[in-house]
């Protein structure tokens, strides 16, 4: 398993009294929709399950590279590599050095919005938007694995979702979503802009021009035209954009022109992808589809990666927006992904050249993932909330254990709590860990499921006089409530903790004696972890935490 090192302590240990040791962490996914064996030559959707939104893709020779948005999590913008579009391996992150960004004080759904990856003349380029933390930027590298350059800011470019296009003559252009010219006509009225881009100075040059005002039909008041990408095929320039907002009305539209500057005419069959016209209440729904990026294969076929979500009820999903893959059909010079009313398939025929036996774990399908904390650096799946300002995670001081140094910044803060999270990738899952009891009072530690600072669970343990108590706290809004607690004996044996999910219901268990799991709270309504209730753009993450105890009844 590839490893990364930006979260690990090297030389600045915190006070030993604040240290809590974790022996292992395990995540198991058991979604019924993934239980059916794959037919030979087929793959599963999503190809990246869990909080992997806003995919962008490029091809270099026979290899494909893909990036996703991460918002206020760190490291930022994972970079994946594949040889067949189905099996992906994370090879790096565009932002993994602490000095590159500062997310302090930001909500979890601010920070790193959608990025775009392209390759030109032996170099990779990623452009993106660090919302409320610098704005639009460009970074580059000779290898997708990095190291990536420092971020070069683009102060003259407003809006979000920048994307680079390289024409056949080598000219570079920067597209982005921005305000329309003049006064917006309605809420959600945006425009797609384009400007030449100088790769030597990493800055746009020359005049900017609106390529698309509002959407494909301004009279219908389309909202949130965004995620623009430009492609060239058979003498046409194709402009593809997301329209309708990243929710149930999400869609993808396409336009084309003989001239890179336009004018661009819409396809006769827009949108080329949406799920908004499907029946509500259908079994195993996939919704919110859009934010497409296209890529061609060496044999001339085209494929689309895009985001979509898997609700467990209504528009509630705790897994966030995920990355899906579908083939593109070209008809009469226009691309099409799905016809109107067609559902996104969970199983589809794999691209040409994919091995007959497909194993997409641990990024799709049902699987068990375990970290025994045996390596000196964290596995790439681990994320922190915002950029660490101190070294609170340590895999070196005690080999085979993860030591977290408790911090006063808790899960409800907009700072950097001592919390390592991995993405919840299934609606039916079990996450568990084993830890030693904190050596002193005033420290809570355990296992957390986090959506944002006002939506999380913490299943933990704290010293209480001569004993200890196991508790489960729930944050729903601005108040933290203890759902259940029970006293346990103080022993030297590790305490096991478990959070399990069944759609919108989560259960919490512990084992303090080695004699088996005991339920602390069962079937609690966890819909506050869904985007529909919590707001924002991220999915849930789950993992170990340690914090210095504040007043437990404090209300923010």
Model-based region annotation:
Residues 1-11:
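N-terminal export signals
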Residues 12-556:
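Carbohydrate-active catalytic/glycan-binding domains of CAZyme proteins
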């Amino acid at each position: 398993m590839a490893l990364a090192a930006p979260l690990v302590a090297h030389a600045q240990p915190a006070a030993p009294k604040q240290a809590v040791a974790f022996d292992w962490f395990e995540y198991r996914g058991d979604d019924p929709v993934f239980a059916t064996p794959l037919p030979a030559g087929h793959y599963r959707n999503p190809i990246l399950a869990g909080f992997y939104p806003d995919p962008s893709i490029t091809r270099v020779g026979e290899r494909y590279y893909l990036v996703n948005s991460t918002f206020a999590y760190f490291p930022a913008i994972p970079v994946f590599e594949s040889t067949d579009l189905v099996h992906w391996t994370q090879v790096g992150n565009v932002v993994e050095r602490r000095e590159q960004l500062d997310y302090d004080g930001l909500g979890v759904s601010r920070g790193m919005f959608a990025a775009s990856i392209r390759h030109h003349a032996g170099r990779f380029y990623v452009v993106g938007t660090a919302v409320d933390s610098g704005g639009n930027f460009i970074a580059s590298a000779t290898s997708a694995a990095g190291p990536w350059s420092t971020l070069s800011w683009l102060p003259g470019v407003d809006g979000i979702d920048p994307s680079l296009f390289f024409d056949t003559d080598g000219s570079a252009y920067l597209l982005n979503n921005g305000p329309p010219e003049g006064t917006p006509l309605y809420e959600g009225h945006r425009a797609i802009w384009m400007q030449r881009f100088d790769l030597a100075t990493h800055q746009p040059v020359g005049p900017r021009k609106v390529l698309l005002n509002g959407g494909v039909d301004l009279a219908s008041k389309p909202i949130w035209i965004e995620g623009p990408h430009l492609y060239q095929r058979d003498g046409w320039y194709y402009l593809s954009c997301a329209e309708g907002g990243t929710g149930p009305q999400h869609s993808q539209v396409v336009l084309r022109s003989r001239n890179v500057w336009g004018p661009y005419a819409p396809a006769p069959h827009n949108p080329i992808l949406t799920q908004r016209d499907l029946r509500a209440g259908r079994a195993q729904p996939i919704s919110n589809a859009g934010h497409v990026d296209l890529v061609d294969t060496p044999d001339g076929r085209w494929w689309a990666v895009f985001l979509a979500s898997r609700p467990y009820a209504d528009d509630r999903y705790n897994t966030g927006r995920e990355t899906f893959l579908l083939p593109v059909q070209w008809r009469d010079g226009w691309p099409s992904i799905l016809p109107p009313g067609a559902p996104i398939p969970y199983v589809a025929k794999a691209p040409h050249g994919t091995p007959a036996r497909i194993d997409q774990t641990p990024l799709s399908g049902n699987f068990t993932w375990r970290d025994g904390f045996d390596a000196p650096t964290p596995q790439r799946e681990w994320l922190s909330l915002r950029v660490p300002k101190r070294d609170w995670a340590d895999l070196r001081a005690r080999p085979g254990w993860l030591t977290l140094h408790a911090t006063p910044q808790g899960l409800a803060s907009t700072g950097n709590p001592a919390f390592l999270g991995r993405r919840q990738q299934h609606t039916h899952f079990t996450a568990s860990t084993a830890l030693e009891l904190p050596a002193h009072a005033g420290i809570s530690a355990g296992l957390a499921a986090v959506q944002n600072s006002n939506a999380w669970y913490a299943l933990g343990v704290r010293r209480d006089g001569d004993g200890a108590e196991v508790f489960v706290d729930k944050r729903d809004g601005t108040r933290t409530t203890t759902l259940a607690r029970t006293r346990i004996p103080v022993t030297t044996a590790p305490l096991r903790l478990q959070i399990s999910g069944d759609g919108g219901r989560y259960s919490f268990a512990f084992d303090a004696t080695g004699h088996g799991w005991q339920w602390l709270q069962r079937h609690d309504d966890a819909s506050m972890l869904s985007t529909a209730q919590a707001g924002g753009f991220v999915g849930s993450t789950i993992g170990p935490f340690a914090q210095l105890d504040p007043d437990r009844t404090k209300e923010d």
